[in-house]
Amino acid sequence: MSKRIEVNDLNVYYGKFHAVEDVSLTIEPRSVTAFIGPSGCGKSTFLRTLNRMHEVIPGAYVEGEVLIDGNNLYGAGVDPVLVRRQVGMVFQRPNPFPTMSIRDNVLAGVKLNNHRISKTDADDLVEGSLRGANLWNEVKDRLNLPGSGLSGGQQQRLCIARAIAVSPDVLLMDEPCSALDPISTLAIEDLIEELKNDYTIVIVTHNMQQASRVSDRTAFFTIAGTGKPGKLIEYNDTNIIFSNPSAQATEDYVSGRFG
């Protein structure tokens, strides 16, 4: 688990609209990388290109390369379903399957991929995934109850458990704490710090303090105006981005002068 991501000259389009322009960067394994920038700058769109989730929108396509340990996710014959198994996604709002039990939520991805699994192996996978998401001790006595009955923070950790149950190499998180209270946010941030020991993690956040707390490296995106493509302005170690950025636009954003 945990893979290196290399992006070369990536451009993202929705039909004729150029959404993200000419991004190149490398994300090292077992690290947390934060994408920051104003609304509409393309950071979430770019995040979705890392597991081809943007393709659910009709007319979406990319030019350029996304390599995971040297393998191009956009190569001829590459199955997007297999890509999304390798590169998991946690969304902005917790989205457990409301009619499924906690246990079945964890196993949902495994069953979707048609993996046959014994009850013993399933039990072990459920426990291991919930432990990996720091949720086991809170739910071990109610695994057969609906996941929708959990608190917001617990639901988000359940979604993380569901994501890691299929053994991905990379975890993408699109503003995973934006709908959570401060205590639940802290629990997710602590979990991210633990998960990076096993996964490559990329997180989109509007919270500058969160980016500075959880990430090793930070990419700042911005946009010149309505209808213009988002651009990567600066990518560096997080402490440099927040203390001594090279671009004036980065300094203006992280210091709160705009954005």
UniProtKB/Swiss-Prot annotation:
Catalytic activity of the protein: phosphate(out) + ATP + H2O = ADP + 2 phosphate(in) + H(+)
Taxonomy, superkingdom: Bacteria
Alphabetized InterPro entries for the sequence: AAA+_ATPase (IPR003593), ABC_transporter-like_ATP-bd (IPR003439), ABC_transporter-like_CS (IPR017871), P-loop_NTPase (IPR027417), PstB-like (IPR005670)
Keyword rRNA processing part of the UniProt annotation: no
The ABC transporter domain, residue ranges: 5-248
Group of enzyme by EC: translocase
Binding site for ATP: 37-44
EC number of the protein: 7.3.2.1
UniProt keyword list: ATP-binding, Cell membrane, Membrane, Nucleotide-binding, Phosphate transport, Translocase, Transport
Localisation per UniProt entry: Cell membrane
Record bears the keyword Lipid metabolism: no
Recorded topology in the membrane: Peripheral membrane protein
Alphabetized GO MF terms: ATP binding; ATP hydrolysis activity; ATPase-coupled phosphate ion transmembrane transporter activity
GO cellular component: plasma membrane
Pfam families per UniProt: ABC_tran
Single GO BP term: phosphate ion transmembrane transport
Subunit relationships: The complex is composed of two ATP-binding proteins (PstB), two transmembrane proteins (PstC and PstA) and a solute-binding protein (PstS).
NCBIfam families noted in UniProt: 3a0107s01c2
Family: Belongs to the ABC transporter superfamily. Phosphate importer (TC 3.A.1.7) family.
Record's function text: Part of the ABC transporter complex PstSACB involved in phosphate import. Responsible for energy coupling to the transport system.
Protein name per its UniProtKB record: Phosphate import ATP-binding protein PstB
Annotated source species: Leifsonia xyli subsp. xyli (strain CTCB07)
Gene (UniProt): pstB
